[in-house]
């Protein structure tokens, strides 16, 4: 089962191609910071704009680059169950440590449809499956009762929870018990979720500040709640501003500001708007850097 800090890693582009030089440096940064793993080809990695060839290549190159030093949980979700299975099987052949499977978007299946979709994906996976519930992007909410049913399936071992609803998260944790781990899909709710039984985060902000996110989670797990809380409060403005526009627009801009990649992003997403809010975001990040956060 997955726990700790997993970075929903960006996909850097240069001249509309994946920039592997920058990408490998990002992976090195994550390894050095001590994250538990990275999640390529997720929402933050702009997976909807990757071709099937790019998707497979990016996962393969990630596994090769990290050399087993951290886990690779590959995004293989689709609104077509058949396609999700194909992506999952391909990722498993490339020796990933797990897969991230998002709710089928656009189709708006029933809870039974969601159950059967994830059941089918899990049956074709040779590695643990992390479910991904993000109704704000998929228009469908994977209910705790459905997750409880799914927790009986051998391969389904974790869930990335991005509903923003702590009440639902608490109910989910109480239902699945020790059958599954639950990780936050919202940076600003990582600490609150840990307090009610969550075990980590799939983080966007850890692209830029992986060590800080690792420290916050570890402090809490070690019983150093005050220290964990300090990091949470220091980052609270950055957590909010990192989602001032559709993810990954703000974090992609932030990574470019600090020299980690080009600001390039693929349509239909566009570059971060230049306004008072973006200036505020950059300043908040600079303040965190001045405080010594990495």
UniProtKB/Swiss-Prot annotation:
Pathway info: Amino-acid biosynthesis; L-lysine biosynthesis via DAP pathway; (S)-tetrahydrodipicolinate from L-aspartate: step 3/4
Residues annotated as the enzyme's active site: 132 (proton donor/acceptor), 160 (schiff-base intermediate with substrate)
SMART domains: DHDPS (SM01130)
Keywords: Amino-acid biosynthesis, Cytoplasm, Diaminopimelate biosynthesis, Lyase, Lysine biosynthesis, Schiff base
Keyword ATP-binding found: no
GO MF entries: 4-hydroxy-tetrahydrodipicolinate synthase activity
Site feature: Part of a proton relay during catalysis: 43, 106
Subunit comment: Homotetramer; dimer of dimers.
Protein name per its UniProtKB record: 4-hydroxy-tetrahydrodipicolinate synthase
């Amino acid at each position: 089962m997955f726990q700790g800090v997993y970075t929903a890693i960006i996909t850097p582009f240069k001249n509309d191609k994946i920039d592997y030089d920058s990408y490998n440096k990002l992976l090195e940064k994550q390894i050095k910071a001590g994250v538990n793993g990275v999640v390529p080809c997720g929402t933050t990695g702009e997976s909807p704009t990757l071709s099937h060839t790019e998707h497979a290549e990016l996962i393969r190159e990630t596994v090769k680059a990290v050399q087993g030093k951290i886990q690779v949980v590959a995004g293989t979700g689709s609104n077509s169950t058949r396609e999700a299975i194909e992506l999952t099987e391909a990722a498993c052949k490339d020796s990933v440590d797990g897969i991230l499977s998002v709710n089928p978007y656009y189709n708006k299946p029933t809870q039974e449809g969601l159950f059967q979709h994830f059941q089918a994906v899990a049956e074709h996976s040779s590695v643990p499956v992390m479910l991904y519930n993000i109704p704000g992007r998929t228009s469908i909410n994977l209910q705790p009762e459905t997750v409880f049913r799914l927790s009986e399936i051998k391969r389904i071992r974790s869930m990335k929870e991005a509903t923003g609803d702590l009440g639902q998260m608490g109910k989910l944790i109480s239902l699945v018990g020790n059958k599954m781990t639950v990780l936050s899909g919202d940076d600003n709710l990582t600490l609150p979720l840990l307090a009610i039984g969550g075990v980590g985060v799939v983080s966007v902000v850890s692209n830029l500040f992986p060590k800080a996110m690792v420290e916050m989670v570890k402090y809490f797990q070690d019983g150093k709640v005050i220290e964990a809380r300090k990091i949470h409060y220091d980052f609270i403005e950055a957590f909010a501003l990192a989602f001032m526009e559709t993810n990954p627009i703000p974090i992609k801009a932030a990574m470019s500001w600090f020299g980690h990649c080009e600001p390039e992003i693929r349509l239909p997403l566009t570059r971060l708007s230049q306004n008072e809010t973006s200036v505020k975001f950059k300043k908040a990040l600079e303040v965190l850097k001045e405080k010594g956060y990495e």
